[in-house]
């Protein structure tokens, strides 16, 4: 499949504020195309996660990948995480312990905004992968934050709604 870099849909576009719809055919060519476009675009824009609405697709899919970036002094080696695909994800648990940390977003990039957001330190999530196989994942630290941030996108929420 040819690499396609999508512009990141910005806040103000109605798809960013709409609740994304479930994917009905997880293994379709259309779903595979969305996953590939999300992955290529996330990597191109230097993001650690990207959700369907961020490329104008109002479907419940997001991808994450925490790669090494020498310009990011705050990223620990323990935070690195391979590419993960989440289709029709559902948060199934969240820790009581909350952690405040800085977030940014490709969908508010024009404003260069960052904000401090309090989120559970760890979460459990269930989703389907690109092969239609259901999986459960317990995430903590940066991956937990990225998952929650991307889940918010699927529900029409942007981090600035939660920032202090």
Map each language-model feature to its residues.
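Active-site rim/adjacent substrate-binding subdomains
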Residues: 1-148, 153-164
């Amino acid at each position: 499949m040819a690499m396609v870099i999508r512009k990141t849909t910005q806040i103000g576009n109605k798809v960013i504020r709409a609740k994304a719809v479930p994917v009905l055919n997880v293994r379709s060519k259309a779903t595979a195309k969305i996953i590939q476009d999300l992955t290529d675009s996330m990597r191109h824009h230097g993001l650690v996660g990207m959700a369907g609405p961020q490329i104008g697709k109002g479907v419940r899919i997001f991808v994450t990948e925490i790669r090494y970036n020498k310009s990011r002094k705050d990223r620990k080696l323990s935070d690195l995480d391979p590419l993960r695909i989440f289709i029709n994800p559902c948060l199934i648990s969240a820790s009581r312990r909350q952690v405040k940390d800085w977030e940014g977003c490709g969908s508010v990039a024009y404003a260069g905004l960052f904000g401090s957001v309090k989120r559970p330190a760890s979460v459990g999530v269930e989703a389907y992968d690109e092969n239609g196989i259901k999986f459960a994942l317990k995430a903590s630290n940066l991956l937990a934050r990225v998952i929650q941030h991307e889940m918010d996108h699927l529900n029409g929420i942007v981090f600035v709604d939660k920032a202090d």
